[in-house]
């Protein structure tokens, strides 16, 4: 998915070129450590070749040596005079640096013996700051899961139904995690409790609260190191983490609004003022005034973009680069001979999408579906959908589904619904028409439920009751579960299922343009009516 081609190295003597070609051949057959050593040997005499250091870095990375890969790529970034190549090398180096640092926050676990699991769970369930959640069922071949799990919050959960006072500063935050296990008779282990969280004030406060709540029911183990370090997270990543505990019945639109507010705070306050090792300890705001940090700052913004993508958030990259006075990487020049499959992800994102030929665009769309950078995928699909010749060679249903997900995830519900309608008009030959329409009606239902007052929700639910329910009666429970999540009453409670006399109305396969079946005198009640 992230192809990286070794750069062309055209400098050096005839003997040096022979060694460089040998290194390239080793790299081509997967002998990356040997190739890296050969490339590195040449840097002792050709000290100022960005391409050589770039090659060393890629081979070290392919061989799994991220520390030396980062060192070589940092060096290549310093030597390149080509700004895009420099930024790409520096971006890779910073990505490798993230988890190869001593500046870490330990994830710690305390272990305690439990006198009575039943009594303990009763005590914990009574605590307003202890939020119990479901644990996965045991699967064959895996260790038994905990009998119960809790989050310890910094304040009691808000259960609504009025969430008007919920804000970024009032949302309950996660302090620690509790797992409770039954005794293991075969191993001779007693019932146990594990308390896990980031080392610091929050974890110790959670531990004190647990000791108070479960007094006489647990005892910390003295035969083991307490706490045990079970993991770590980079300290620089801490400002980008947030540990919310949102109410289960919080409307999805409100959840999305709060997430967008949090991202806005990160982009405008948190990240611009955070000290970054890649910037010599300076913050992005400070580094923006120092031309020596131009490449490193641009790379740091691309690393931030990668983090946003992991969290399903789309950063307006061009605007954010401009905010710090950094120029966007220029579009690539392409022609019919350009080997698009050899481009790195960052290079692919620089393609002039509108200028690509139809076959090139199809190739880019297929790859973008794998790499799943939301901003780039949306742009590529948007153009592809305007070209009928492209649609013939794309996995159209997958592309339409992806477009709906992109729009919905970004809060563009109306646009997502438009693509649902487009999809209905482009039936698949791989499934029956009934199944095809059912799938897209379910997609529409999920979107409509984001706003229970949507007037189009009633006729859609009527369709499920009168058309789908007689044919697939087992789907009722699933639909009702969806509705209950959004506080919408079951339509089966207020709309009569069609009788045999009206069965002819629904005997034909439903189509989007067909009139809805006649409903009984009773109607669906929705909040606000």
Language model features: what each stretch is:
Residues 9-45, 345-379, 383:
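Alpha-helical segment of the N-proximal tetratricopeptide repeat
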Residues 14-17, 21, 51, 55-59, ...:
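"A position-specific structural signal for the A-helix of alpha-solenoid helical repeats
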Residues 15, 24-31, 60-64, 68, ...:
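Hydrophobic/aromatic side-chain positions at a characteristic register within alpha-helices
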Residues 38-40, 68-76, 108, 375-386, ...:
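Alpha-helical repeat scaffolds
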Residues 61-72, 83, 94-115, 405-418, ...:
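Alpha-helical linker/edge segments of TPR/alpha-solenoid repeat scaffolds
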Residues 90-175:
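Short Lys/Arg-enriched alpha/beta "domain-start" segment
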């Amino acid at each position: 998915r992230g192809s990286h081609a070794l750069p062309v190295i055209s400098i050096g003597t005839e003997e040096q070129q022979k060694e460089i070609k040998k290194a390239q051949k080793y790299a081509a057959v997967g002998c990356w450590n040997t190739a890296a050593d050969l490339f590195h040997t040449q840097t002792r005499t050709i000290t100022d070749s960005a391409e050589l250091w770039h090659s060393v870095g890629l081979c070290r990375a392919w061989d799994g040596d991220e520390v030396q890969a980062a060192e070589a790529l940092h060096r290549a970034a310093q030597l390149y005079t080509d700004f895009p190549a420099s930024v790409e090398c520096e971006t890779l180096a910073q990505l490798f640096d993230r988890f190869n640092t001593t500046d870490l926050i330990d994830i710690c676990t305390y272990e305690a013996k439990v006198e009575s699991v039943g009594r303990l769970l009763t005590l914990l369930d009574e605590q307003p700051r202890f939020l119990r959640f479901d644990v996965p069922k045991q699967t064959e071949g895996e260790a038994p899961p905990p009998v119960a799990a809790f989050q310890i919050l910094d304040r009691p959960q808000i259960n609504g139904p009025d969430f008007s006072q919920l804000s970024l500063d009032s949302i309950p935050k996660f302090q620690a995690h509790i797992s409770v296990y039954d005794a293991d008779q075969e191993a001779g282990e007693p019932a146990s409790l594990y308390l896990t969280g980031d080392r610091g004030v929050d974890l110790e406060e959670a531990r004190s609260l647990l000791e108070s709540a479960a007094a006489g029911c647990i005892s910390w183990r003295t035969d083991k190191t307490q706490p045990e370090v079970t993991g770590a997270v980079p300290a620089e990543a801490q400002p980008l983490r947030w540990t919310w505990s949102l109410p289960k019945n919080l409307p999805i639109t409100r959840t999305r609004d709060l997430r967008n507010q949090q991202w806005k705070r990160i982009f405008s306050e948190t990240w611009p003022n955070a000290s970054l090792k890649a910037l010599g300890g300076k913050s992005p705001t400070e580094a923006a005034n120092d031309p020596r940090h131009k490449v490193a700052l641009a790379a740091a913004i691309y690393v931030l973009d990668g983090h946003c993508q992991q969290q399903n958030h789309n950063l307006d990259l061009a605007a954010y680069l401009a905010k710090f006075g950094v120029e966007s990487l220029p579009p690539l020049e392409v022609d019919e001979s350009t080997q698009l499959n050899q481009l790195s992800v960052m290079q692919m994102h620089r393609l002039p999408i509108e200028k690509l030929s139809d076959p090139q665009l199809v190739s880019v769309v297929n790859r973008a579906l794998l790499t799943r950078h939301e901003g780039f995928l949306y742009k590529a699909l948007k153009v592809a959908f305007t070209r009928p010749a492209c649609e013939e060679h794309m996995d159209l249903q997958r592309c339409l589904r992806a477009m709906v997900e992109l729009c919905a995830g970004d809060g563009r519900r109306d646009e997502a619904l438009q693509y649902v309608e487009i999809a209905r008009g482009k039936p698949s030959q791989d499934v029956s028409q009934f199944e095809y329409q059912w799938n897209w009606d379910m997609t529409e239902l999920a979107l409509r439920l984001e706003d229970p007052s949507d007037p189009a929700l009633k006729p859609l639910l009527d369709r499920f009751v009168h058309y789908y329910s007689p044919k697939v009666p087992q789907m009722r429970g699933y639909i009702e579960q969806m509705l209950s999540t959004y506080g919408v009453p079951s339509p089966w409670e207020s709309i009569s299922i069609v009788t045999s006399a009206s069965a002819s109305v629904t005997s034909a396969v439903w189509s989007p343009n067909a009139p809805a079946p006649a409903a009984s005198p009773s109607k669906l009640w929705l909040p606000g009516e």
